[in-house]
């Protein structure tokens, strides 16, 4: 087992793992220990009261955070004709069909989001082995397969996140950067939780959002008192 560095020991000593912090206090604790030489991301882990073994209880969705994530996504759009030109206006980084698919197969292009129009799914379907491991397979439910590629690109560029639960029923995503104002981080967290509640499966009984923890890239998790949100 790797030894804890002095910094990690200090962080762990400064966070009470038995306590759920009021949101403003939680953010203050995060910022206190966000001392890396780069601007750390602020991540969130949400424990859901679901049975992830049941497909109808899995949660996934998409929401645009009010203050973005602090990072601009690189967007690849698969479409043709007028849609191809239109997708460039809101900032699509890569636009194409078979030509783009071949470049991606060869590992020649970097991107964070894939958006195809419905007629392009026949092309994107060939990229399952590349997109699958990265969790980038487009999905109609979260709006990444759409005839309105312009709107989808705008959303992706505006800080849209696409949370989905892991096999343990926990959702991991980002809600901003450590240099965001406290109110911005709070607003983003509230928006995320509202989106998750909206996506709650009808078959889930009891408490849906069981625990919320926030952390920075190099920091420890801080549990948040949901009553303070």
Curated annotation (Swiss-Prot):
Cell inner membrane keyword on record: no
Entry keyword set: Repressor, Ribonucleoprotein, Ribosomal protein, RNA-binding, rRNA-binding, Translation regulation, tRNA-binding
The UniProt record lists the keyword Repressor: yes
An example Gene Ontology CC term for this record: cytosolic large ribosomal subunit
Molecular functions (GO terms): rRNA binding; structural constituent of ribosome; tRNA binding
GO biological process: regulation of translation; translation
Coiled-coil stretches: none
Name of a matching Pfam family: Ribosomal_L1
Subunit structure: Part of the 50S ribosomal subunit.
Sequence similarity: Belongs to the universal ribosomal protein uL1 family.
Function in brief: Binds directly to 23S rRNA. The L1 stalk is quite mobile in the ribosome, and is involved in E site tRNA release. Protein L1 is also a translational repressor protein, it controls the translation of the L11 operon by binding to its mRNA.
UniProt protein name: Large ribosomal subunit protein uL1
Originating species: Actinobacillus pleuropneumoniae serotype 3 (strain JL03)
